[in-house]
Amino acid sequence: MYKRQAQQIALQKKQLAEANNKVPMSLKAVAEKYKVQPVVAEKASQMNVLALGDSVMVAASTNLQEVFPHMYIDAAVGRQAESLATDLTNAKSKMPNPDAYLIGLGTNGTIKEDEIDAAMKVAGNKPVYWMNVHADRVWAKPNNNLLTKMAKKYKNLKIIDWNKKASGQSSWFYSDNIHPKGTGAEKYAALVANSLTNVEK
């Protein structure tokens, strides 16, 4: 089991490295592949986004990088929100002044209110977009409820409803119904693009 997990981590690190070094696609190709408006593709291509997440984000990292060529992705297998503020601070050394933050955490355990507070302090007044949780885990619904509550506390915290978008779409995922693949990873990236560019579909 440990060997398999180590192989998975190595594979995901390789995938993430490839994503961060990807050659940008043309805007037309992005719009067509991800079924987003050309204006969405254009805006996304110009945004500096600092993304921090868990293995779900790793699974969609190549797609995120195609849509957001200036996105810096720091995603890790098994990551939880307890280290979010520290992880964000460290990631800011790679992108000190992002236009927006994208966070994808909550798959691996419970999110606490003070963890979100600490992360929002690091983000300052910059927009923070948090991808909510789509997973058959006991903490998924409480996490999503907390995120919705915290978005009312912070005007610059926006929740991206991945759980609603992905509901009933088992073909978008690997057998665990958590990690997106193929069409699912494309839909994940498209949802992020439409959310961060604030362009109505």
Per-segment meaning from a language model:
Residues 1-48, 94-97, 199:
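N-terminal secretory targeting modules
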Residues 75-77, 130-135, 159-164:
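A generic structural motif
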Residues 119-144, 166:
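Active-site segments of SGNH/GDSL-like serine hydrolases
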Residues 38-115, 135-141:
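Conserved SGNH/GDSL esterase-like catalytic core that processes O-acyl groups on lipids
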Residues 46-47, 69-71, 96-101, 124-129, ...:
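Loop/turn elements at helix/coil->beta-strand transitions in domains of secreted/extracellular proteins
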